[in-house]
């Protein structure tokens, strides 16, 4: 497990935008994501399977609160997403809501 507590996808962003890109260290199979202050926001996890690939694909997430599966994160909490075979991961904010943070906690 790689501890990525310092990797920030978003930190109090206030407009729609694309996050920083996380390279998949050691070809991890799952990423744990912490989202705070994001009630009412719409976030999408995206990935690429090849470093040369230009298309981004949506990755579904599992809420670690109720184990619900979704293509979007719409509230604060802990989430896990499968990333086996994915080389780059990013988040896209589809809603201009300020004051939220999104961190990658770990890659297993």
Region locations from a protein language model:
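Short proline/glycine-enriched turn/loop motifs at strand-loop junctions of beta-rich domains
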Residues: 28, 37-42, 96-97
């Amino acid at each position: 497990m790689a501890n990525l507590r310092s990797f920030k996808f978003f930190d109090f962003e206030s407009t729609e935008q694309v996050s920083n890109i996380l390279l998949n260290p050691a070809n991890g199979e799952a990423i744990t994501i912490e989202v705070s202050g994001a009630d009412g926001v719409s976030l999408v996890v995206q990935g690429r399977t090849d470093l040369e690939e230009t298309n981004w694909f949506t990755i579904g997430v599992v809420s670690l609160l109720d184990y619900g599966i979704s293509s979007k994160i719409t509230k604060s909490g802990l989430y896990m997403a499968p990333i086996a075979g994915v080389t780059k991961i990013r988040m896209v904010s589809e809603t201009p809501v300020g004051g939220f943070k999104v961190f990658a906690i770990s890659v297993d």
